[in-house]
UniProtKB/Swiss-Prot annotation:
Gene source species: Bacillus licheniformis (strain ATCC 14580 / DSM 13 / JCM 2505 / CCUG 7422 / NBRC 12200 / NCIMB 9375 / NCTC 10341 / NRRL NRS-1264 / Gibson 46)
Encoding gene (name): tmcAL
Keyword set includes tRNA processing: yes
Name the UniProt record assigns to this protein: tRNA(Met) cytidine acetate ligase
UniProt GO MF annotations: ATP binding; ligase activity, forming carbon-nitrogen bonds; tRNA binding
GO biological process: tRNA modification
């Protein structure tokens, strides 16, 4: 069976994601869609609106066939590391192609851009270092360096757009690793990634605008038009069971406690706490009464909201620089954690299992690795804002839940 790989967050799964999966299968003529999905916390450092299990169910009910977890060590990272981790896992699972949505929509431009930057990588990095020295943030410095290096590059992708940036890094990772996996793209329909309002006519809205509506209204009334029915059902069920949808503000009391009980030297050892940020963090947390207020006090021209939000998540999970460095030194995936599969997905995995060089994990108790322990810890932190007994129930799912199975013919879940 031929499989297409997708790199996803599904926060939550919406009509644009449904379009993406259908296009991916159709354009690549693949029978199976394999999604590598961020777990409890996402690339921008935010908690997922609902658990990875609920989001897996949304995906399986909407034409994904295999859902595996992108480990925390890759998921809560800058675009380059995020992409490298996801590409490695999809390659390990035997995907013939990687299909991504982008603002540009032309794969030749991505191939040309990636090839040009690989060829001029030393010059690009040197130019970026100069811009950072002038006080620019890492994304701003890279964007300026990139424009300088690619001025003569011809058909080049606009890397000021968020999905173009991720797509560029997928293509670059495939090229640098010399993989046979073929990158392909489709132009995003309607709303942009960061759009915070709903479009007037189209049934496709950004995940950002959907979450904004959900958190502002406390209901799905305004957003259900942009969501598959299965997503609406899962969001409703999650709120009924766990009493909330997760937002960054929910974690502020725990962040405040962590920072008040952590000395400056310990804070300095946390991943992404750089260049004296520990002093700024300590000062901001003393004055702030909310997560938003804290972030406004913390943010500078040099450090973006996203970069600081990731740092805060690493503080919550007590992720140390030394541990990250050691885990990122591994050249191949240490394991692949299966979250869910359809009948067709199960058949595909049975076909590929013998050729896997990394163990396919279905229960966390059957395997031990520092990266997996970090995933479990992230899940425990994720459940912190919940009230008992559902907090313990969600935490226990990290250990007790087997992969979710979905019968795509009868359209029923075989295990709740």
């Amino acid at each position: 069976m031929k499989a297409v790989g997708l790199v996803v967050e599904y926060n939550p799964f919406h009509n644009g994601h449904l379009y993406h999966i259908k296009e991916a299968k159709s354009e690549t003529r693949s029978e199976v869609a394999v999604a590598v999905m961020s777990g409890s916390f996402l690339q921008r450092g935010e908690p997922a609106i609902v658990s990875k299990w609920a989001r897996t169910k949304m995906a399986l009910a909407s034409f994904a066939d295999v859902v595996v977890e992108l480990p925390y060590i890759f998921a809560v990272q800058k675009a380059e590391t995020f992409a490298e981790g996801a590409v490695s896992i999809l390659n390990e699972l035997g995907c013939s192609s990687l299909f991504f949505g982008s603002e540009h929509g032309d794969i030749e431009a991505f191939l040309n851009t990636a090839a040009h930057t690989i060829e001029h990588e030393d010059r690009l990095n040197e130019e970026a270092r100069k811009q950072i020295a002038f006080g620019l943030s890492y994304p701003q410095a890279m964007a300026k360096a990139f424009r300088s290096v690619t001025r003569e590059g011809g058909n080049i992708v606009d890397l000021s757009k968020p999905n173009n940036i991720l797509g560029f890094h997928y293509v670059k990772a495939i090229m640098q690793k010399q993989l046979s996996m073929k990158p392909e793209t489709v132009k995003r329909r309607s709303s942009g990634y960061h759009d915070s309002t709903f479009p007037e006519a189209d049934r496709i809205a950004s995940a950002t605008s959907i979450r904004k509506s959900i958190f502002e209204t406390g209901s799905l009334a305004d957003s259900r038009f942009y969501l598959p029915k299965t997503t609406v059902d899962e969001l409703d069920e999650y709120a009924r069971t766990f009493g909330m949808w997760h937002s960054p503000e929910d974690y502020f009391p725990f962040l405040k406690y962590s920072l008040h009980t952590m000395d400056t030297e310990e804070l300095k050892g946390i991943y992404e706490v750089e260049e004296g940020l520990e002093h700024r963090v300590k000062k901001a947390i003393r004055k702030a009464g909310s997560f938003k207020e804290y972030m406004e006090l913390l943010k500078t021209k040099r450090y973006t909201w996203t970069r600081l939000q990731r740092m805060n998540t690493h503080i919550l999970t007590k992720t140390k620089k030394a541990d990250v460095k050691r885990m990122l030194n591994e050249t191949h995936p240490a394991y692949i954690r299966l979250l869910g599969m359809t009948k067709k997905g199960q058949a595909y995995l049975a076909e590929k299992k013998k050729s896997l060089s990394a163990p396919l994990i279905t229960k966390t108790g059957s395997f031990s690795h520092p990266s997996l322990q970090l995933d479990i810890k992230a899940g425990q932190v994720y459940s912190a804002p919940l009230k008992e007994p559902v907090r313990t129930m969600l935490t226990e799912q990290e250990y007790s839940l087997s992969p979710i199975r979905y019968d795509e013919d009868s359209r029923i879940f075989l295990r709740k």
